[in-house]
UniProtKB/Swiss-Prot annotation:
Biological classification of the source: Bacteria, Pseudomonadati, Pseudomonadota, Alphaproteobacteria, Hyphomicrobiales
Keywords annotated in UniProt: ATP synthesis, Cell inner membrane, Cell membrane, CF(0), Hydrogen ion transport, Ion transport, Membrane, Transmembrane, Transmembrane helix, Transport
Family matches, as NCBIfam families: ATP_synt_6_or_A, PRK05815.2-4
Organism: Brucella ovis (strain ATCC 25840 / 63/290 / NCTC 10512)
PROSITE patterns in the cross-refs: ATPASE_A
This protein's name: ATP synthase subunit a
Family statement: Belongs to the ATPase A chain family.
Subunit structure comment from the entry: F-type ATPases have 2 components, CF(1) - the catalytic core - and CF(0) - the membrane proton channel. CF(1) has five subunits: alpha(3), beta(3), gamma(1), delta(1), epsilon(1). CF(0) has three main subunits: a(1), b(2) and c(9-12). The alpha and beta chains form an alternating ring which encloses part of the gamma chain. CF(1) is attached to CF(0) by a central stalk formed by the gamma and epsilon chains, while a peripheral stalk is formed by the delta and b chains.
Disulfide links within the chain: none
Length: 249
């Protein structure tokens, strides 16, 4: 088990729940999603309450997160898109905290599960579609008809735009899932090398130096990837929201 890089992604039932043949068990994934929400909410509450003129380091971090999301949303969707700020900020904090939690030993990375990332992506696309039709009616369909396209190729362009739009939740979810999965597998493999070689005695201990250095380097890289994936997910979400706010190209 120690050297199995896939074992860390196993879903375990903690509280079995069966309702009419539907498995609604509370799993380790469920527990760490709850933990992610609690930690993110607690962090924001502690850093935003009792703010002083001179911000603490943690307060500065929360303000940087706030400004990043606000700037990204404003740049992508304009002032009208700011109504989606609570939604986008919540997504950013959830993905960011979930990614960071998974980097600690014996903790679970919920964003390494495709069902979790796909659910987040469907939430984004569902929000875009709902608001687009709610605000613009059938005018939202102008999203699939770019302006300035010659009439003879409009059907082909519309088909391409529809396929591109429908592929968004797939690309958005797979990008996050694949990066977190691959990074953790690589980290586990090199950590396994260290454990295996150290059990060989003095000769093995000498051979652990390179794998150990690689493990440290990959761990540092994974912290960067954890932030970058939350960053990319948020920026793309802001761009998709712009399509709902301004469906015309």
């Amino acid at each position: 088990m120690a050297n199995d890089p896939i074992h860390q992604f196993q879903v375990s039932r903690w509280i079995p729940i069966d309702v009419g043949g539907v498995d609604l068990s509370f799993t380790n994934v469920s527990a760490f999603m709850v933990a992610t929400v609690v930690l993110a909410s607690g962090f924001l509450y502690l850093t935003s309450s009792g703010r002083g003129l001179i911000p603490t380091r943690l307060q500065s971090v929360s303000e940087m997160a706030y400004e990043f999301v606000a700037t990204s949303l404003r740049d992508s969707a304009g002032s009208k898109g700011m109504k989606f700020f609570p939604f986008v900020f919540s997504l950013f904090m959830f993905v960011l905290v979930a990614n960071f939690i998974g980097l600690f030993p014996y903790f679970y990375t919920v964003t390494s599960q495709i069902i979790v990332t796909f659910a987040l992506s469907l939430l984004v696309i569902g929000t875009v579609i709902f608001y687009g039709f709610f605000k613009h009616g059938f005018g939202f369909l102008k999203l699939f008809v770019p302006s300035g396209v010659p009439g003879i190729i409009v059907p082909l362009v519309v088909l391409i735009e529809i396929i591109s739009f429908l592929s968004r939740p797939i690309s958005l979810s797979v990008r996050l899932f694949a990066n977190m999965l691959a990074g953790h597998i690589t980290l586990k493999v090199f950590a396994g090398f260290v454990v295996s070689l150290s059990s060989l005695g003095a000769l093995g201990i000498g051979g652990t130096v390179l794998p150990l250095l690689m493990t440290v380097a990959i761990t540092a890289l994974e912290f960067l990837v954890a932030f970058l994936q939350a960053y990319v997910f948020t920026v793309l979400t802001c761009m998709y929201i712009n399509d709902a706010v301004h469906p015309g190209h």
